[in-house]
Regions:
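Noncatalytic regulatory segments and standalone regulatory/sensor domains
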Residues: 104-105, 127-207
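Cysteine-nucleophile protease catalytic domains, especially the papain-like/related folds used
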Residues: 1-88, 203
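Intrinsically disordered, low-complexity boundary segments flanking structured domains
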Residues: 65-70, 96-101, 164, 174-177
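Short, flexible/disordered intra-domain loops and linkers
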Residues: 50-55, 89-91, 144-152
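Active-site-adjacent substructure of cysteine-protease-like catalytic cores
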Residues: 85-144
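Hydrophobic transmembrane alpha-helix bundles
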Residues: 66-82, 112-127, 149-160
Length: 207
């Protein structure tokens, strides 16, 4: 059985929440070892505030890269059928040819750093026409000013937002869900190797 995706508990834990949501989306509850949950929380929330308070600046890029590499090694050991790839800079964009779109079209997900007033992590789970299906872990129950960004509460195990492509590739940090300056971008692609599809399988499916 798969669990519903969940929301962050504080103002700071969007990173580990999105990483654990990635596992919850890709795997049955019985397939997720407790070690994966423990290490996700252990490696994240590593940034200190200006006052020196741990965790109050969220999760660093270094921590996400480390966690991505750890998941890969965990998969290589055969403990869990997981694989991961860390992307940064020019590799992080939304387009028909992008690595993120390719992952979403082939059974994978992407945990992406973007902007929601401040730097923020969300989980991308799919594509619908020219929109990204994503789960934003920051609970919000008011409609957006942007009428083309849709809220969805009917797919709790998959997504809660439908966001047009056009928002993501913006470098302006003031734009909601913008990926921001190219040199600062990052994403973590994650797959369940048992459910990952290859291009040939997708083509045959649509035929």
């Amino acid at each position: 059985m798969k669990n519903p995706l969940h929301y962050q508990l504080s103002e700071y834990d969007c990173g580990p929440t999105s990483m654990m949501n990635a596992l919850a989306y890709l795997f049955e509850r019985e397939e997720i070892p407790p070690e994966a949950v423990r290490n996700t929380m252990l490696y994240c929330l590593d940034c200190h505030s200006k006052e020196g308070i741990p965790g109050k600046r969220g999760t660093s890029r270094a921590a996400m890269m480390f966690l991505s590499n750890w998941l890969n090694e965990y998969g290589d050991l055969g403990i869990m059928s997981v694989s991961s790839e860390y992307l940064s800079g020019r590799s992080v964009y939304i387009d028909g040819e992008s690595r993120i779109n390719h992952a979403l079209n082939h059974g994978g997900v992407a945990v992406v750093r973007l902007y929601l007033e401040e730097e923020h992590y969300v989980l991308m789970t799919g594509i619908q026409n020219e929109n990204i299906l994503l789960f934003d872990p920051y609970y919000w129950d008011k409609p957006y000013e942007q009428k083309d960004i849709l809220m969805d509460d009917k797919h709790p195990k998959e997504y809660n937002r439908i966001v047009p492509f056009q928002y993501f590739n913006q470098e302006n940090k003031e734009i909601i869900y913008a990926l921001g300056p190219v040199e600062e971008r990052e994403a973590v692609l994650i797959f369940n190797e048992k459910t990952k599809t290859v291009p040939e399988e997708v083509i045959e499916y649509f035929i």
